[in-house]
A protein has these predicted regions:
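Terminal presequence/propeptide segments associated with secretion/organelle targeting
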Residues: 1-14
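Buried, small/hydrophobic-residue-enriched core segments of structured protein domains
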Residues: 9, 16-80, 140-154, 158-385, ...
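Gly/Ser/Thr/Ala-enriched C-terminal appendages of enzymes
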Residues: 16-110, 268, 274, 278, ...
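Residues that form generic nucleotide/phosphate-binding pockets
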Residues: 104-105, 121, 125, 192, ...
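Short beta-strand/loop turn elements enriched in aromatics
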Residues: 107-150
Length: 575
């Protein structure tokens, strides 16, 4: 074997004559890539948890260890989250995201190697006055999980179906242990499963924005077009610019996939790919356009050459986004983009030149572009219900500079005032605006204990902040006409009514742990969102229930617990 001295790991390999370029007695050196140690390490599932959860089995009550039932709920009315987005009295929340997190946590079985690694990591993680000590974790329970349950925790997770509309203070997920003694395992992944709040809030805000977009289309057309046409046009009014807005790649990917339940325009193809795969690779799940970046413009000596290049390589009918503020927005639109759009109109090639400002005054720039296009004949005029409207043809806009719900509404109002239907002239690209204001506190997401022990003894929390209190359980969730009209959808299991929750996961079923709720595909969830946003009531809150749509029996038990644990608090606030 040869001796080599360089910066690579080198392995000498003898190739046979079948390669056709060496004799059997020849040797060829093959270089192997030299890599450093990894920076991203696969975290043991046991450590995907809060530190106080990992050690809590040591000091939990015997009843809680025997059996614990938890629920996830959103406790805040939406108008308190953002009055520019959510209308007063409309508390519809869209439930999504649970299946993906269960896939992340439990699809691959937990192994003894993960337990060993967890033990090594925790060997010095507890701080004491006598130095660092091992942090306790219930190793024996996890060894049993691997040996007896095929590596998946024996907990059952039930929830409403993804895409369902839910309301503040309703239970949306129920988590409980199945065999006795695993009660603390029902809380182990609290901090991770609770992260469904991000998916729910992303989809909820977009579902409400879609309702607003439909109102804009309806304002123009009224009943002269079908409901399906209204939804189609409304669906064109927003494009996800969020690929670079996320704090970590997983956030951008997951939330971008969620956004596609409502609006199909996206630049985040990692999320689009996930939605595509989860739809059975259906066509039309996501779409985008050719788009110039500032770097493309800067790469040409002449800005005009760049825009002409994009227009020339685009096929007939192409919709192309031209960033126009690299040097001077108004000059670029009037002297470069307008002539291109006019030439496209003359050639009748169907191409649309889309002017995209990325700095300046958005309202001024958008209205000015529409007026300029109309002035030069790049529009059609239609009279609808005795009102004249101008519709764009070969030059339109996409506005994506720091868009917020309030700013987009402001621009739309200005366009409508001047006879330009917003959906006929362009759309809004929203990146950070879709996720910058997402927060667990917005919906007041809570993972709460509601029952313990073999007898399922009800428990709840009475906080100093009224809206942070919880309910005694366990529960059923009803969706009958009677329950919705009476605003009493949360009941005990022994009360009348059919539970709409379904099983998602049961680790005690070692051969088929994933259940009905997990299996819905992207298209099924998307359709459920559309159906329920059209048919479910706006709210289940009234003056009598204090935003807790529960049965009288749950209220009675809650008052009993209040008298026992917090007798100085006013019962009228919890009845």
């Amino acid at each position: 074997m040869g001796i080599h001295s360089n910066n690579y790991d080198i392995e000498d390999t003898q190739f046979g004559t079948s390669f056709g370029y060496c004799r059997p007695d020849e040797f060829i050196s093959v270089k192997k890539v030299k890599l450093p140690k990894r920076k991203i390490h696969k975290t043991p599932r046991l450590l995907i948890a809060d530190s106080y959860t990992i050690s809590s089995n040591l000091f939990a009550s015997e009843e809680a260890k025997e059996k614990s039932v938890y629920y996830i709920t959103y406790r805040r009315v939406l108008e308190k989250v953002n009055h520019n987005l959510y209308n007063k009295g409309d508390n519809r929340i869209v439930f999504t995201g649970l299946s993906r997190i269960l896939d992340y946590l439990f699809y691959e079985p937990i192994t003894h190697e993960e337990i060993d690694e967890t033990k090594r990591f925790l060997a010095d993680k507890k701080v004491t006055t006598k130095g660092l000590k091992p942090m306790y974790f219930p190793e024996e329970l996890w060894r049993r999980i691997v040996d007896e349950y095929n590596g998946r925790p024996p907990i059952k997770i039930r929830a409403v179906k993804e895409g369902s509309v839910v309301y503040p203070n309703e239970p949306v997920v129920i988590i409980e242990n199945i065999p006795e003694g695993f009660g603390e395992l029902a809380a182990w992944f609290e901090s991770t499963i609770l992260k469904i709040w991000a998916s729910c809030e992303m989809v909820t805000q977009l579902a409400h924005w879609f309702e607003y977009c439909k109102s804009i289309v309806y304002h123009v057309y009224r009943d002269t077009i079908s409901k399906d046409q209204v939804k189609f046009l409304a669906g064109l009014m927003l494009h996800n610019f969020g690929c670079r807005a996320g704090m970590v790649p997983q956030e951008s990917e997951w939330l971008a996939a969620d956004a596609l339940y409502i609006f199909s325009g996206t630049d985040t193809f990692s999320g689009a790919y996930q939605a595509w795969k989860n739809s059975g690779e259906a066509a039309g799940i996501a779409s985008s356009v050719f788009a110039l970046a500032h770097r493309n413009v800067q790469g040409f000596e002449s800005e005009k050459d760049c825009h002409e290049k994009l227009n020339s390589v685009a096929e007939d009918g192409s919709i192309d986004s031209h960033v126009a503020d690299c040097y001077a927005y108004f000059d670029t639109v009037e002297n470069i983009l307008l002539p291109l759009a006019m030439q496209n109109a003359i050639e009748e090639n169907g191409k649309v030149v889309v002017g995209r400002p990325d700095s300046g005054d958005p309202a001024e720039q958008v209205l000015w572009l529409c007026k300029l296009a109309h002035k030069h004949g790049l529009s059609t005029v239609q009279t609808i219900l005795k009102k004249e409207w101008r519709f764009g043809t070969s030059m339109k806009f996409i506005e994506g500079d720091g868009m917020s719900w309030e700013k987009m509404k402001e621009i739309n109002e200005d366009l409508i005032l001047h006879g330009f239907p917003p959906f006929a002239w362009g759309l809004y690209g929203v990146g950070g605006g879709l996720r910058n204001e997402l927060a667990r506190d917005n919906f007041s997401a809570k993972y709460a204990l509601c029952a313990i022990g073999k007898e399922l003894k009800p428990v709840c929390k009475f906080s100093e902040t009224l809206e942070k209190t919880t309910l005694p359980g366990p529960f059923k969730l009803l969706r009958s006409k009677e329950a919705l009209e009476s605003m009493k959808t949360v009941v005990f299991p022994d009360e009348p009514g059919e539970d709409v929750m379904v099983d998602y996961f049961n680790g005690a079923d070692i051969w088929e742990p994933f259940k009905e709720g997990y299996n819905d595909d992207f298209l099924t969830i998307k359709q459920r969102i559309q159906d329920q946003m059209e048919t479910m009531p706006l709210t289940l809150s009234n003056m009598d229930n204090h935003n807790y749509p529960t049965s009288d029996k749950i209220k009675e038990v809650r008052i009993q617990l209040l008298k026992k644990y917090a007798p100085k608090k006013l019962a009228q606030n919890y009845s």
